[in-house]
Amino acid sequence: KCAASSSDSVPVKVEQRLREKAQAGKAYCDKNGYNTNYCFLVDFSIHSGKRRFFVWDFKGDSVKYASLCAHGYGKNSTVSKPVFSNVEGSYCSSLGKYKVGIRSYSKWGINIHYKLHGLEATNDNAFKRYIVLHSYTPLPETEVYPLHLPLGISQGCPVISDEVMRKVDGLLKAE
């Protein structure tokens, strides 16, 4: 099963790293007036065949859901080594903090996506680049390690499983 119901299914070292990122994220959200119920964390240092998209529950101080997550295929990215860029047309993923925007129709996955607004110099072109959070039906629900996710699933968007996207959509609609 792809979705983690608790932090038990996340390796301890990964959870510690996520907790540190989540604490910094919560401080940023508090300071800037953003929602402090949940945050989404993507750790592209994790092998693409393992879960690397996480929904962090601030109240429970733990991972609520986890999914595989595709990275962009542009600028000579490989299945094992993503290349990051904020340039329009690069088809690369971008690092940094994002604000989740409006829910919209998507032709991929469960047919919805959320607009992403980059909040840092490394991703401030995200909205112009049409970077959105969406799912893709062929993306596996379970880890495929030691295999990698194939390139071509993402043109820079964080792409997650349909199952976790349904759960993320439920959380966001409830906010």
What is each stretch, according to the model?
Residues 2-155, 162-175:
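Cell wall/extracellular polymer interaction/catalysis modules
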